[in-house]
């Protein structure tokens, strides 16, 4: 059965089965902070455009499987278009390198921002001024944040309406869920 374009890792079918595990480990090394494999070692299998897709596909696949904490059965469902040799190579790499991939994913999240919230304070104010005769009674939140970045604490002050505050809370809750899933 020939794999369909668009299924995860379908480009691996071009690779001889005995080279599969080696390539997968080298690509995992690459996104874990070491050197990626060189195209020149695989130029007889893929052209340079295909090679870029292979690197992206394998990286995306392993990050998704580990990030979403797929079971072996769920992973096999993703690989059902690959031949058994390639499926086995992917599963062996995944089993042996799962923790390392997870650490790389956590590192990416931490690298998004090295800034950390040190302290915060908030005040609720009621805006009573208006350019019309009727008064404007709109609650405003003043949020003071002390953010530590590169061993320096920088103060930030933000004024938000009720809607903006709700949006901030929703974003923080979503970020917290992602962090908890990765633990």
Curated annotation (Swiss-Prot):
Keywords: Cytoplasm, Nucleus, Transcription, Transcription regulation, Ubl conjugation pathway. Its main location: cytoplasm. It is found in: Cytoplasm; Nucleus. PROSITE patterns: COMM (PS51269). Pfam families: COMM_domain (PF07258), COMMD8_HN (PF22838). The keyword Metal-binding does not apply. Residues 116-183 form the COMM domain. Coiled coil: none annotated. One of its GO terms (cellular component) is nucleoplasm. Belongs to the COMM domain-containing protein 8 family. Component of the commander complex consisting of the CCC subcomplex and the retriever subcomplex. Component of the CCC (COMMD/CCDC22/CCDC93) subcomplex consisting of COMMD1, COMMD2, COMMD3, COMMD4, COMMD5, COMMD6, COMMD7, COMMD8, COMMD9, COMMD10, CCDC22 and CCDC93; within the complex forms a heterodimer with COMMD4. Interacts with RELA, RELB, NFKB1/p105. Interacts with CCDC22, CCDC93, SCNN1B, CUL1, CUL2, CUL3, CUL4A, CUL4B, CUL5. This is COMM domain-containing protein 8. It comes from Mus musculus.
